[in-house]
Amino acid sequence: MKALFLIFHGFEEANGISKKIRYQVKALKECGMDVHTCYLNEENGHKCRMIDNHTLRDYGSGIKGKLRKRFELQSIVKYILQENIQLVYMRSYHNANPFTISMVKQLKRQGVKVVMEIPTYPYDQEYITRRMKLDLLVDRCF
């Protein structure tokens, strides 16, 4: 079975979440799945959506790059359908918004199974800045 492990951020080698994701991908592969990883790469303010180590979509830099990385998800849908991906495993990262919901609906209409991992720890108290609280508010709305 072909699967896509979809995350909405990049990898940091010293980060525990990044290590967990890499172990999850490894475990899925050991179970016989053909797993590809979709993630964001941001170097020097330049943003790209990656599949494994290949650029799926170059969003550029600046405000346009920041907006595109959040709202442009059609490249992911196109890749999934072209590659006949049967399962998408998404890791939630404050990305509950109309664009993500629309992407999931499109995939489900095409028969793609979608699983979303949602962190269960009480993270609300960890958000102290206005920007963090805004992310949390949007996440709660959708």
List where the protein language model places each region:
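Membrane-proximal helix-turn-helix segments that form the acceptor-binding/catalytic region
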Residues: K26, Q74, P98, S102-Q110, ...
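Short aromatic-enriched loop/helix-cap "lid" or pocket-rim segments at secondary-structure transitions
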Residues: G16-S18, K47-I51, T100-S102, E126-R130
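Residue-level recognition of beta-strand->loop/alpha-helix junctions
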Residues: Y39-N41, G60, P122
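Histidine-centered beta-alpha loop that forms part of the nucleotide-sugar donor binding/catalytic region
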Residues: F8, S92-Y93, E117-P122
